[in-house]
């Protein structure tokens, strides 16, 4: 059977798909069989414009030869090397390049295989760091309502999406949550950072007072919350969190799995907002989504704290079979080179105003209650159908696919994050397509 041959529902039962209504999908499957640059090819031969960079990850566009050829060369030369007590050059080279790209002071890298693993790694680093310092009482972790930090137990514990948590009973103990910053009444149709909501950062002081600073290890937030609907921080909010965490000796972790590698027009959101965390979590765009890989960057102060014991003792009991995998490292190096050569990390700044104008032209379309944007990411929030939340946005998703473009929905929000190679005519096509869809769905 060719890769473009039709797939019948009987072929689909074995794969229990993630974050998918499996029975619904398998009655009317939507299949991709190819991709190039800004487009997917479906199993029936249609071209679909990618408005979401896959799942927020294909920042350089699909099937870029520099990246795919680097993977093929590496697979033929060195397919696997253990990272425990052994090494290979490309992992060290990639770590060095990440440090050069990252905000000053984030000088050491731990490799993982996904954003979820990167979050787990960051949380473990934070807890262990305080123990090594003799501050074992610092066991609490602070997340945020509507935050998404992957699907492992640490991530869903500090995460704040109720539907991701409620099925699994008791999660990590000692976790608290900041309030989210989304306020439609005051901030609807804002371009960039909202004016209202800075005071919500001061809720961290309340949490510190409630639990005592001596019990809190770290605060973790997404600089821009992506998976919950593109929630952009109010002006000054992240700096206020930074000030409070420093005041109380609490580590600040930025989850940049989505915002990293150019999404906001800077290498990282930390650069955009001018706020440097103690730990930064990345994945997705690190390898352009071609192969699983994540990276956690930590400050020299954290790293050096672990390096105080005898040299023959393992400093941090953590890692993965595929940490710094040779093929993933080759993909990461080729991806970073592509970003640099093509100026992709700056595209969000260059195209941001055009992107904003295009998105906000949807303001008066049916059922639109908010449009928000920053860099090359945006969201269109829809009025839910009474008694049927999520149905309107999902109808838009299906209609969009049928019309030749891919969008992402979360709740009743359409989220957009095109590959950074996007051109103005792609933006026009995407936004005009969404306009047509909004007018067509109930």
Named regions from a protein language model:
Residues 2-442:
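Conserved N-terminal phosphate-binding loop of PLP-dependent enzymes in the Aspartate aminotransferase
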């Amino acid at each position: 059977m060719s890769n473009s041959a039709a797939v019948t529902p009987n072929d689909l039962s074995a794969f229990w798909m993630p974050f998918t209504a499996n029975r619904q999908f398998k009655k009317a499957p939507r299949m991709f069989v190819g991709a190039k640059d800004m487009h997917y090819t479906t199993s029936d031969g249609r071209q679909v414009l990618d408005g979401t960079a896959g799942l927020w990850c294909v920042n350089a566009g699909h099937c870029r030869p520099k990246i795919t050829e680097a993977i093929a060369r590496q697979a033929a030369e060195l397919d696997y090397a253990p990272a425990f007590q052994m090494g290979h050059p490309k992992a060290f080279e990639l770590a060095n390049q990440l440090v050069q790209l990252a905000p000053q002071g984030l000088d050491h890298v731990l490799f993982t295989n996904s954003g979820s693993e990167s979050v787990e790694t960051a949380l473990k680093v934070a807890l262990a760091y305080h123990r090594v310092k003799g501050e074992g009482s610092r066991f609490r972790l602070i997340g945020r309502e509507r935050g998404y930090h992957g699907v492992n137990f640490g991530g869903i514990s500090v995460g704040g999406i109720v539907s991701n948590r409620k099925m699994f009973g008791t999660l990590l103990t000692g976790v608290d949550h900041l309030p989210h910053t989304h306020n439609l009444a005051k901030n609807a149709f804002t371009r960039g950072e909202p004016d209202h909501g800075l005071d919500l950062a001061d809720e961290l002081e309340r949490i510190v007072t409630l639990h005592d600073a001596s019990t809190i290890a770290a605060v973790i937030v997404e600089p821009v919350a992506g998976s919950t609907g593109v929630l952009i921080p109010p002006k000054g909010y992240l700096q206020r969190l930074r000030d409070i965490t420093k005041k109380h000796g609490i580590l600040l972790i930025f989850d940049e799995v989505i915002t990293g590698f150019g999404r906001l027009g800077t290498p990282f959101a930390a650069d955009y907002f001018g706020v440097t965390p103690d730990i930064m979590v990345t994945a997705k765009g690190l390898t352009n989504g071609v192969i699983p890989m994540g990276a956690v960057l930590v400050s020299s102060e954290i790293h050096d704290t672990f390096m105080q014991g005898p040299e023959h003792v393992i400093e941090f009991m953590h890692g993965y079979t595929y940490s710094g995998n040779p093929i993933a490292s080759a993909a990461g190096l080729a991806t970073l080179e592509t970003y640099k050569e093509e100026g992709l990390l700056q595209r969000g700044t260059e195209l941001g105003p055009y992107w904003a104008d295009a998105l906000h032209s949807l303001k008066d379309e049916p059922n639109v209650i908010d449009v928000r944007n920053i860099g090359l990411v945006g969201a269109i929030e829809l009025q839910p159908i009474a008694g049927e939340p999520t149905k309107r946005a999902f109808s838009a998703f299906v209609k969009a696919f049928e019309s030749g473009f891919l969008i992402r929905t979360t709740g009743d929000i359409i989220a957009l994050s095109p590959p950074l190679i996007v051109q103005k005519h792609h933006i026009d096509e995407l936004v005009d397509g969404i306009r047509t869809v909004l007018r067509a769905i109930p």
